[in-house]
UniProtKB/Swiss-Prot annotation:
It comes from Arabidopsis thaliana. Belongs to the cytochrome P450 family. Its EC number is 1.14.-.-. It is a single-pass membrane protein. GO terms for molecular function: heme binding; iron ion binding; monooxygenase activity; oxidoreductase activity, acting on paired donors, with incorporation or reduction of molecular oxygen. Heme binds at C439. This is Cytochrome P450 71A15. Its cofactor is heme. Keywords: Heme, Iron, Membrane, Metal-binding, Monooxygenase, Oxidoreductase, Transmembrane, Transmembrane helix. GO terms for cellular component: membrane. The chain crosses the membrane at residues 3-23.
Length: 496
């Protein structure tokens, strides 16, 4: 009899434990955002494709712009409209300013001691101040104008050669070389293409991007942690972190050994904070390498993606290309003269073209994950602390409610009389994010994008190989957190 009673008690307890989540969900379901049915253990992961920004938009069309998913055991709030983004990143910005602590990122990035993934707090505020005030301010951006001009000239010579030979040009490769070399010279004082060590640095950065953009199964489904072990996720993270750290240690030591340098790069400036603890801010030697990594990734990924996609859209829309060429060329008779930043900074159609490129192809379609640190009420729904937040900028910027029935079309004219800007105050248009976590390097990226695009369009006419065109080829996206073209942009430039 005692055995039966004990068995019944155990069965009751077990049933309660198993049914408790269902009971809780039933009681609270009226206060939770809409959510698709989820599979035990994996949650809603089976509903994601290789391009999650697209599959999440499809789900939002069915369940609404504020949607609750589960990646394994972790609740994920998906934001797909501007009004929800406004409430989240303005009204509740402080409550959602943190980042999830992911082991793979902390393994690579020294515990997350940099700008993008660092937890919100005093340290993050300090290093963001360093970046915004001392590295990426307007004066610093202007001081590197000569670097941009020199690397632009190198690029233009390569395009000129392809034009003279009537040979195909891999514009994607040329643009990533340009952006990498500019970022390298600004950060380290030298560029990738000149030294083997810098080429190795570039390779490690690519590996870091792939690891950060991957899905760490163990973080969301602990019982499947063996999958990460089999694919060697954390071993690769430790390996790339060590190799990258060793490379950066050499760079830092070279800067410490150098004397009487005529110009200061970012490493020099960061080292001055380590030596002097300037403005009450302390930057450790070990932190410098990862702050530089943030700047390098932001300076290459964002800029390259924007240039590549905007050139793609211009070539696909010859009427837009002609309007831009007419604006840039104006009454000039000598089109071989390079256009300076001062000449192009007030060109309205150029800015409209760039804005439209960013609207359709934001460099990071899904903004970097945020973590809710307090319970909030959002659009009448109760959202619990500990929920991770995905903002689908790609979906927001193609929303027909905001942008009209032609939201999927490349039409720069929509920006000519529009007050919308990408500085984070217009939530219909957030390619760089918004609030405390907005990208601090917008000015740095735009300075290179404007002058590069203007000179490519001014000096040459462009066409694609007819065999390598069409939407399936032109607009196919690669996988990863930074969505660039799946296929390289192969073009034929000709002298204007």
């Amino acid at each position: 009899m005692e055995i039966i009673i004990i068995s019944l008690c155990l069965a009751t307890i077990l049933a309660f434990l198993l049914l408790k989540p269902l009971l809780n969900r039933t009681v609270a379901k009226d206060n939770l955002p809409p959510s698709p049915w989820r599979v035990p253990v994996i949650g809603n992961l089976h509903q994601l494709s290789l391009h999650p920004h697209r599959s999440l938009r499809s789900l939002s069309h069915r369940y609404g712009p504020l949607m609750l998913l589960h990646f394994g055991r972790v609740p994920i709030l998906v934001v797909s409209s501007s009004d929800v983004a406004h409430d989240l990143m303005k009204t509740h910005d402080l409550k959602v300013a943190n980042r999830p602590r992911l082991k793979v990122i902390e393994t690579i990035l020294n515990g997350g001691r940099e700008v993008v993934f660092s937890p919100y707090g005093d340290y993050w505020r300090q290093i963001k101040t360093v970046c915004v005030v001392h590295l990426l301010n307007k004066k610093m951006v202007q001081s590197f104008a000569k670097v941009r001009e020199e690397e632009r000239s190198v690029m233009m010579e390569k395009v000129e050669k392809a034009s003279s030979d009537s040979s195909p040009l891999n514009l994607s490769k040329l643009l990533i070389t340009l952006t990498s070399d500019v970022a390298s010279r600004v950060s380290f004082g030298k560029k990738h293409s000149n030294e083997a060590s810098m080429s190795d640095f570039k390779n490690q950065v690519r590996k870091i991007t792939e690891l950060v953009g991957g899905f760490p199964v163990s973080e969301y489904i602990p019982c499947l942690a063996w999958i990460d072990q089999i694919r060697g996720l954390y071993n690769r993270a430790e390996e790339v972190s060590k190799i990258f750290g060793d490379l950066m240690d050499k760079v830092v030591q070279e800067h410490l050994d150098a004397t009487n340098k005529p110009t200061k790069d970012f490493v020099d400036i960061l080292l001055s904070f380590e030596r002097q603890s300037k403005d009450g801010i302390e930057v450790r030697r070990s932190d410098i390498k990862f702050i530089i990594l943030d700047i390098f990734l932001g300076g290459t990924t964002t800029t390259n993606s924007l240039l590549e996609w905007t050139m793609t859209e211009l070539i696909r829309h010859p009427e837009c290309m002609k309007k831009l060429q007419d604006e840039i060329r104006g009454d000039a008779t000598n089109l071989t003269i390079y256009r300076s930043h001062e000449e192009v900074e007030d060109m309205k159609y150029l800015k409209a073209v760039i804005k439209e490129g960013l609207r359709l192809h934001p460099p990071f379609p899904l903004l970097v994950l945020r973590l809710l640190t307090q319970d909030v009420k959002l659009k009448g729904y109760d959202i619990a602390a500990g929920t991770q937040v995905i903002t689908n900028a790609w979906a927001i910027q193609r929303d027909i409610v905001t942008w009209g029935i032609d939201a999927e079309e490349f039409r720069p004219e929509r920006h000519l009389d529009s007050p919308l800007d990408f500085r984070g105050t217009n939530f219909e248009y957030i390619p760089f994010g918004s609030g405390r976590r907005i990208c601090p390097g917008i000015g740095f990226a735009m300075a290179l994008v404007e002058v590069t695009l203007a000179n490519l369009v001014n000096r040459f006419n462009w066409r694609m190989d007819a065999r390598l065109s069409g939407d399936e080829y032109d607009l196919a996206e690669a996988t990863g957190i930074d969505v660039c073209r799946k296929f390289p942009l192969i073009v034929f430039p000709s002298n204007a």
